UniProtKB/Swiss-Prot annotation:
It is found in: Cytoplasm. GO terms for biological process: protein catabolic process. It catalyses: N-terminal L-lysyl-[protein] + L-leucyl-tRNA(Leu) = N-terminal L-leucyl-L-lysyl-[protein] + tRNA(Leu) + H(+); N-terminal L-arginyl-[protein] + L-leucyl-tRNA(Leu) = N-terminal L-leucyl-L-arginyl-[protein] + tRNA(Leu) + H(+); L-phenylalanyl-tRNA(Phe) + an N-terminal L-alpha-aminoacyl-[protein] = an N-terminal L-phenylalanyl-L-alpha-aminoacyl-[protein] + tRNA(Phe). Functions in the N-end rule pathway of protein degradation where it conjugates Leu, Phe and, less efficiently, Met from aminoacyl-tRNAs to the N-termini of proteins containing an N-terminal arginine or lysine. It comes from Shewanella pealeana (strain ATCC 700345 / ANG-SQ1). It is an enzyme of class 2 (transferase). Pfam families: Leu_Phe_trans. GO terms for cellular component: cytoplasm. Transmembrane segments: none annotated. The gene is aat. This is Leucyl/phenylalanyl-tRNA--protein transferase. PANTHER family: LEUCYL/PHENYLALANYL-TRNA--PROTEIN TRANSFERASE (PTHR30098), LEUCYL_PHENYLALANYL-TRNA--PROTEIN TRANSFERASE (PTHR30098:SF2). Belongs to the L/F-transferase family. The keyword Glycoprotein does not apply. Keywords: Acyltransferase, Cytoplasm, Transferase.
Length: 236
C-alpha cells in the first residue's frame, strides 16, 4: 500500500521504500531531522532528502531510479574535444565546504536553492566522519565546478553538482566515475534522470532493481585510498 509516513525526532527507522507515493513520485516520509545517523540510514536503504526551504524535511525513493555504472559513462566526441583543450586540474576532498556552497548557489531559471545552511552543515558532519566526499575542478587555482555525495559500500550516492565554467560539472562527473571504477565501486546513484545526466548516459532502472543492487553492494569494500586527499586525472 502506498502511503506517506510521518517521522518524529526519536524515530530513526524509515518505512519500506516500496510504500512511497506514486504522485508525487517517490515521496515516502515527512519530518525527522538531518542527524548523520538518520542520513546514513536513509541512503543505506535507498532514500534521500529533498525539500524546499519553507517545507518540512521530505524523504524520497523515486521509481524509476537514475544510475550510472562506473566505466560506462557516455562522453560525446565534442565534449572530449572541448575538455582536451582545457588546462583543468581535478582533486578529491580538497574543498568540500566550497563545493557544497557552490552547489547551493542560485541557478538560472530557479527561484532559489534547496541546499540550505542546515543541509550544508549536515553533509559537512558526514564529511568529517568519512562518509561524504567531494570532487573539485580547478582552473588556475580557482574552483570552477564540482560535486559531492556519499559512499555507501560499493555505491556512490551523488547529491549535487555545480559549474561556473561551461562543462565543468560534466568533467567532474567523468572524473568521478573513472575514479570510482579504479577504486572498486560498482554503482553511482544519480537519483532522478535530468537532461544533464541523460547527456552523460544515465540509465533509468526500476526501484525494485535498484534496491536489490543496493542491498548487494552497500556492505561491499573498496580501496582504502578511495577518498584520500589527492589530485586525480581525467582519461579522454
Amino acid at each position: 500500500m502506498n502511503s506517506l509516513s510521518y517521522l518524529n525526532h526519536a524515530q530513526q527507522a524509515f518505512p519500506p521504500p516500496e510504500q512511497a507515493l506514486i504522485e508525487p513520485n517517490g515521496l515516502l516520509a515527512v519530518g525527522g531531522d538531518l542527524h548523520p545517523e538518520r542520513l546514513l540510514n536513509a541512503y543505506y536503504n535507498g532514500i534521500f532528502p529533498w525539500f524546499n526551504l519553507d517545507d518540512p524535511i521530505l524523504w524520497w525513493s523515486p521509481d524509476p531510479r537514475a544510475v550510472f555504472v562506473p566505466g560506462n559513462m557516455k562522453i560525446s566526441r565534442s565534449l572530449v574535444k572541448y575538455l582536451k583543450k582545457q588546462n583543468w586540474t581535478y582533486t578529491i576532498n580538497h574543498a568540500f565546504e566550497a563545493v557544497t556552497a557552490g552547489c547551493a548557489e542560485p541557478r538560472a531559471g530557479q527561484d532559489g536553492t534547496w541546499i540550505s545552511s542546515e543541509i550544508q552543515q549536515a553533509y559537512l558532519s558526514l564529511h568529517h566522519q568519512g562518509h561524504a566526499h567531494s570532487l573539485e575542478v580547478w582552473q588556475n587555482n580557482e574552483l570552477i565546478g564540482g560535486l559531492y555525495g556519499l559512499a555507501i559500500g560499493q555505491v556512490f550516492c551523488g547529491e549535487s553538482m555545480f559549474h561556473r565554467t561551461t562543462n565543468a560539472s560534466k568533467a567532474a562527473m567523468i572524473v568521478l566515475q573513472q575514479h570510482l571504477q579504479r577504486c572498486g565501486f560498482k554503482l553511482i546513484d544519480a537519483q532522478v534522470v535530468n537532461p544533464h545526466l541523460d547527456s552523460l548516459g544515465a540509465k533509468s532502472i526500476k526501484r525494485d532493481d535498484f534496491l536489490r543492487l543496493l542491498a548487494h553492494l552497500r556492505d561491499g569494500t573498496v580501496s582504502l585510498d578511495s577518498w584520500r586527499k589527492s589530485e586525480v586525472t581525467i582519461e579522454l
